[in-house]
């Protein structure tokens, strides 16, 4: 996002890191894409993203390019990142989905979808992007950072403390402190999803 904002002449700077990989995964529906073999099979299909123009769509574009597809070769559909995304692929309203956990883990555990591309692991992410791809972070306009150094430092300190805690916490400890809605009614799925994403979390900001 900081790079795209620069192109719009809105200078932004990221100042502390939460995710060192996008933590997004692309899956295809086992209902509408039973004969899926390769990325090019998605041509003309409906691909669910968290929202149009979101980071999930940007990552999808990178992945699809590996299969020789451009942004106009598929129809991107905004489906959110929770229960709506799960129901849309189960009902066949979309053919593929790029999303986060616990959505991805739910679909894979229940056999609703097949994993096609995974950026929840640093090495796999680097293979798609040709290098590191920092993801979740705090960023702000350069002018705000220059005028509010103490606020920026306080935010940085808080995220670093959270990063350090997450790097050592057990999945069970994490589940105890997140809102109940994040568990999507299945604590075990949430725990599995967190463990699957641990590698992508920055340990130190």
Model regions: which residues?
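Short, well-ordered secondary-structure micro-motifs
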Residues: 87-89, 126-129, 149
């Amino acid at each position: 996002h900081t790079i795209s904002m620069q192109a719009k002449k809105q200078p932004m700077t990221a100042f502390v890191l939460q995710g060192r990989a996008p933590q997004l995964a692309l899956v295809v529906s086992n209902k509408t894409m039973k004969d899926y073999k390769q990325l090019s099979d998605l041509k003309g299909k409906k691909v669910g993203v968290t929202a149009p123009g979101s980071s999930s769509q940007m990552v999808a574009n990178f992945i699809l390019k590996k299969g020789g597809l451009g942004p106009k070769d598929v129809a991107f559909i905004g489906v959110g990142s929770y229960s709506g995304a799960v129901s849309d692929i189960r009902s066949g309203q979309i053919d593929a989905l790029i999303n986060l956990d616990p959505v991805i883990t739910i679909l894979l555990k229940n056999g609703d979808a097949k994993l096609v591309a995974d950026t929840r692991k640093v090495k796999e992410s680097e293979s798609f992007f040709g290098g590191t791809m920092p993801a979740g972070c705090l960023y702000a306009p350069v002018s705000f950072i220059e005028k509010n150094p103490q606020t920026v430092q306080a935010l940085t300190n808080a995220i670093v403390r959270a990063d350090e805690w997450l790097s050592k916490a057990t999945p069970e400890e994490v589940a105890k402190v997140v809102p109940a809605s994040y568990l999507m009614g299945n604590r075990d799925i949430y725990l599995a999803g967190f463990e699957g994403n641990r590698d992508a979390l920055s340990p130190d900001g």
